[in-house]
């Protein structure tokens, strides 16, 4: 963890993603060491002067402010950092809750120490994504405005947040349910995975809390199952562990977990974190609905509702400029439907053309709200992933391909449904490279995989 004092500018740390503002290392030191190990590299500043310099010089995505020593100073510093970061959006997490209210002011989330780096890492991921989503909405509105179309502002659904709690009625889990209701949320309890999925398919929820109890297997299985379903894919999930349990952030993320909490964490704080996840989900859902309305603009691909080749090229150029200005990565992926004798027959008989709208719709639902999907050619799709590296883009593309490969498409009366697979490639925009060239590299990698 790199330390930067207010009397001098911070030492350059190109890979730093997290700015930590703390007077000492009582909580910040161990937290930074842990975040460094799980991929959220940190730069620590002792005062607001150095923090403002760091925001300009480093590729910072989120900030953490220690409130345990001087809360008033921390609140003022957070407000100044957000203002200095504009028009970019800077998520700021507070470490400490001096008045016990959990109310954030300039903070996007407040957590009480001690906190495990895994918990922080997962929340940072969610906060950073939310910021990128808001920025992407603005960028997409600009792209459409150039073509005379107005993108209506998102309309967030009103009413109590709907939370599904899944697991045995253990005392600490029941306490969390009570705390959620005290926060104004409505909770629905499911004791088994079967009941949980019945509820998930029948009703809409803003977040799901999974009680691990004495074992994590069933809870992780539910989360993984949600990530394989296009309708449930984006619902945030919190894994509530019993005291003494642990799980690595990579494993948690791979299994579909959005956040972690343990029985050692006060129920009211865990409830506030669940509510924050649920609110973010509602906001993202509203943005997604607003973006989907653009399908009726006459600018999108008629069959799939996705971006056309030309519209995607224009937006990708704007996105590339924005990501460069924000010191964020930008990656692209190409998905090309794989050829096979069976698919050739389906193509010749017109069944593939009939499946294309469903395929395009599935791809559109399986990406994040901030990602852009286009149909470049009859059987070629492209995706743009802001604030994502090449590996993240590749993994996302492979997940999309895996879900669609499990889908049965109609081949006509009395015939066995057919399936499709993709040749895929991903590329991260390199310094000085155009977005179009990066897309060509991704396409070449997809072609190479087909040839192999």
Please place each PLM-identified region on the residue numbering:
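Non-catalytic signal-transmission and effector/linker regions of two-component phosphorelay proteins
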Residues: 1-34, 38-43, 49, 56, ...
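Conserved phosphotransfer microenvironments
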Residues: 48, 61-88, 92, 96-99, ...
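Alpha4 helix (beta4-alpha4-beta5 surface) of REC/receiver domains from two-component response regulators
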Residues: 73-76, 94-111, 118, 221, ...
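C-terminal output helix
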Residues: 115-124, 128, 265-274, 278
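Amphipathic HAMP/coiled-coil signal-transducing linker helices
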Residues: 289-308
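Conserved helix-loop-beta segment at the catalytic/binding core of cyclic-nucleotide signaling proteins
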Residues: 299, 360-393, 402, 406-409
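Conserved long alpha-helical elements within nucleotide-processing catalytic cores of c-di-GMP signaling
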Residues: 308-320, 324-331, 338-364, 374-378, ...
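A short glycine-enriched loop-to-beta-strand structural element that forms part of the catalytic core
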Residues: 375, 380, 384-386, 412-443
